[in-house]
Amino acid sequence: MPFAVRIGLNSGEVVVGRIGDDLHMEFTAQGHVVGLAQRMEAVAESGHICLSEHTARLVEGYFQLQDLGRITVKGVSEPVWHFDLEAVGSFRTRFDRSRARGLSAFVGRDREMAALDAALERARGGSGQVVGVVGEAGTGKSRLCAEFVERCRAREIPVLEGRGVAHGRAIPMLPMLEMWRAFYEIGDDDGPETTRAKIADRLLLMGESYREVLPFIFDLFGVPDPANPSPAIDPEQRQKRIHGVLKQVLHDPAYDGRHVILLEDLHWFDGASDTYLETTVESVPDTRNLLIVTFRPEYHAPWMERPYYQPLPLQPLDPEAIYGLLRDQLGPDPVSYTHLTLPTTPYV
């Protein structure tokens, strides 16, 4: 029997606890926030998700929303806005949202930027490099890398990017597929046929030897070719075959191996991505690629012992840099912030 679900979402503080008697006890949440969520569910159409204004503000940019106007809600003096969730948006992280709203001044990272520039020059000279930007949350890992890759693009150096996300640990190869989608120039709206065509065009341009492995790459991207399915082989052998192909691409003379590859937030990588990351790291030394990875201090991996790996720890911003941020945000009057006690790891 076909059925559809409707969902209502609201955000805010609630009271939680056990409610009932000795015969029946439930753990539940109560309060106005819960009531408004129930109201959103009641007005949602079948198969739709309806959001309150508060929730809509929290997910702005992460999802595409349709403004449905105001409705009258029992217990609320004024009509409330409600929204329909239509599709996934372009934002994936807080940094994406900050960039869309306008970033603060980039200060206090001259030493780190110089280290990345030096690693890039070594890589372009034929000694591939791996640089690990490590720091606690909020120290500016993403901002440093964003500034660096923009400089690279200004010099017409190709950049491939992939990023781990907290909710993506259960999705195999999510950050790696993001990186390779950029390599094959696959868009979000490309269907299976277009995706297969772009992969085949790029690989066969490099050589006919890739034709026999196309079915495996199609499978990796979730677009198997019904007319030419991949052979049934052991999963471990299949993984080795795919890793071998991707490693071969990085070493292929037909591949213009002078990319900057940026993989962010390794601490949120799934197991399959971690395994492939090790393959990528091992592929770097004999290329002209610069691989930059970012992670928090608790992340560790065996490949960090490689001689071509360079850690780049981010130290807290010094007071002069902090005051530079304040001047950018608050203006030049030092009296307005002279007596502030400042943390040195602002989210920028």
Positions of PLM-derived features:
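Short, surface-exposed beta-strand-loop junctions and turns on beta-sheet-rich folds
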Residues: 23-24
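Key residue(s) within conserved catalytic/signature motifs
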Residues: 1-17, 27, 31-340
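Short conserved micro-motifs at the rims of enzyme active sites and ligand-binding pockets
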Residues: 20
